[in-house]
C-alpha cells in the first residue's frame, strides 16, 4: 500500500509539472501582406530620351527666355484587369532659380534650367504627381513637353542634361 501511495504521489508530481508546461506564455503569430494592383508594362524602354536639338545661346540672352516646347509622352500598356489608375510621381534635382517647377541642368551649359510640363502647361516640378486613368485598351499615357529656360539671361554654350525620374504607382 505504501508503494502504491509513493507511485501515485510521483505521478501527481509529474502531472503537476507537465500541466505547468501547458500554461506557458502564449506566442502571437502576426501574418501580414497586401493585395495590390499589379503593375502595367512600360511602353518602350524604361528611359525616354528627349533631344532638344541645337539652340543658339543668343536665344537665351534674357531672363526667362525659353526655347519652343518639345512634345513627348510616357505610356504604359497591358495593365491588369482591375487596375484603373496609374499615378506618376516626378523627382529630380530642382533648379535653384525655380525649384518648384524647373530642374537643374547637369550638362556644361550654364545659366539655364529645364522645364517639364503636362501638355496643358501645368508644371511638373520635383515632387509633382499626375494620375491618369487606364483606358479600355488597358493603357495609360502622360502627354508632356519640355524646354530650356534662361535662368539669368547669360546662357553659355554647352550640353544640356536633366534627369527626372517618374515613379509609377497603380490603383
Task: Report the location of each language-model feature.
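Mature extracellular/passenger domains of Gram-negative fimbrial/pilin and adhesin proteins
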Residues: 2-6, 20-171
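Bacterial N-terminal signal peptides
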Residues: 9-17
Amino acid at each position: 500500500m505504501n508503494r502504491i501511495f509513493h507511485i501515485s504521489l510521483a505521478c501527481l508530481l509529474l502531472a503537476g509539472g507537465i500541466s505547468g508546461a501547458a500554461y506557458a506564455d502564449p506566442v502571437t503569430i502576426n501574418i501580414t501582406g497586401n493585395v495590390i494592383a499589379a503593375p502595367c508594362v512600360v511602353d518602350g524602354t524604361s528611359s525616354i530620351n528627349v533631344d532638344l536639338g541645337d539652340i543658339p545661346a543668343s536665344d537665351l540672352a534674357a531672363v526667362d527666355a525659353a526655347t519652343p516646347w518639345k512634345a513627348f509622352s510616357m505610356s504604359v500598356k497591358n495593365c491588369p484587369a482591375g487596375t484603373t489608375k496609374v499615378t506618376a510621381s516626378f523627382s529630380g534635382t530642382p533648379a535653384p532659380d525655380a525649384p518648384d517647377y524647373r530642374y537643374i541642368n547637369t550638362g556644361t551649359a550654364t545659366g539655364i534650367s529645364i522645364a517639364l510640363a503636362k501638355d496643358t502647361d501645368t508644371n511638373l516640378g520635383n515632387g509633382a504627381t499626375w494620375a491618369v486613368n487606364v483606358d479600355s485598351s488597358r493603357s495609360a499615357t502622360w502627354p508632356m513637353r519640355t524646354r530650356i529656360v534662361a535662368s539669368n539671361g547669360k546662357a553659355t554654350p554647352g550640353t544640356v542634361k536633366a534627369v527626372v525620374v517618374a515613379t509609377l504607382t497603380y490603383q
